[in-house]
């Protein structure tokens, strides 16, 4: 495992610790109510990413719109928290995600190279 993969493993571990602090429970657990709440929160956070980036509305584009990159990054990181929670609720860990990412990435490149 390289350093970047180690970081993802650490992110998953930190999120597990945080969820235990919030709920008193270890993840993963098969709680589809919590999974649904997590997916709803993820969708809301994605909306907050859009609101933090004022340039997404091409019909309202004006010159020199300032984007608060720190606020935008905060929202993106919140999205990661909920994606990690969702992944944990589904019973996967960081290594599962890493392995599947590279497997799927290879397939995606093959598809594009073969006019998919």
Where do the PLM segments sit?
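Flexible "arm" and connector segments at domain edges
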Residues: 1-116
């Amino acid at each position: 495992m390289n350093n970047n993969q180690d970081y993802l493993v650490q992110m998953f571990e930190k999120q597990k610790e945080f969820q235990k602090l919030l709920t008193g429970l270890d993840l993963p657990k098969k709680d589809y109510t919590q999974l649904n709440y997590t997916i709803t929160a993820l969708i809301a956070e994605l909306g907050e990413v859009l609101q933090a980036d004022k340039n997404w509305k091409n019909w309202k584009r004006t010159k020199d719109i300032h984007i608060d990159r720190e606020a935008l990054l905060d929202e993106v990181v919140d999205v990661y928290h909920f994606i990690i929670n969702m992944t944990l609720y589904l019973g996967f860990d960081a290594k599962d995600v890493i392995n599947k990412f590279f497997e799927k990435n290879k397939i995606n490149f093959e598809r594009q190279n073969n006019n998919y």
